[in-house]
From Swiss-Prot:
Residues 56-100, 135-165 are annotated as: Disordered. GO terms for biological process: cGMP biosynthetic process; receptor guanylyl cyclase signaling pathway; regulation of blood pressure; vasodilation; venom-mediated vasodilation in another organism. Its main location: secreted. This is Natriuretic peptide Na-NP. One of its GO terms (molecular function) is toxin activity. Residues 56-68, 135-149 have a biased composition (Basic and acidic residues). Coiled coil: none annotated.
Length: 165
């Protein structure tokens, strides 16, 4: 840790020492001293405004009010679109939000009492999944072969070296 901070401090010192050489004592061009005008001013202000405020609901609302004041005339109150009351009870949801896959699979989500449990994957589907979950090693290949061809394991394997994983 100490070596890294010394390295960072040395690098900063080197940059500060070489900075006057890079500037070569020349003043900045006149274009940098003039403030931007017209459309460039508003574009520059928008870029700066995006970095000054944190991205929250309040900051987005304030930014929208500054950028589009014509939309706020006579609006007042809540500007959210009215929700269609007929769609309120449709679908499988919790308070208007979609149920995540974990909640729908485990039955722990809202409104899941009437649904049958999902079917378990078939053997070929399970094997396709198994290929992606396990590294390709001797043990995983042996396990996969036992799952694919259980009829070959009836005799015990012959060598006596088989073991249950």
């Amino acid at each position: 840790m100490v070596g890294l901070s010394r390295l960072a401090g040395g690098g900063l010192l080197l940059v500060l020492a070489l900075l006057p050489l890079a500037l070569d004592g020349k003043p900045a061009p006149e274009a940098l001293h003039k403030p931007p005008t017209g459309l460039r001013t508003s574009l520059a202000a928008l870029r700066i405004l995006g970095y000054l405020r944190p991205d929250s609901k309040q900051s987005r609302a304030a930014r929208d009010r500054m950028l589009h004041p014509e939309q706020q005339v006579g609006g007042g109150g809540d500007s959210r679109p009215l929700q269609d009351e007929t769609n309120k009870g449709k679908g499988s949801s919790c308070f208007g939000q979609k149920i995540d896959r974990i909640g729908s699979m485990s039955g722990m989500g809202c409104r899941t009492q009437g649904k049958p449990p999902p079917a378990l994957p078939t053997a070929p589907a399970a094997l396709r999944i198994l290929e992606y979950l396990r590294p390709d090693s001797k043990r995983s290949r042996a396990t996969r072969d036992r799952m694919l061809h259980p009829e070959q394991q009836v005799g015990g394997g012959g060598g006596g070296g088989s073991r249950v994983i």
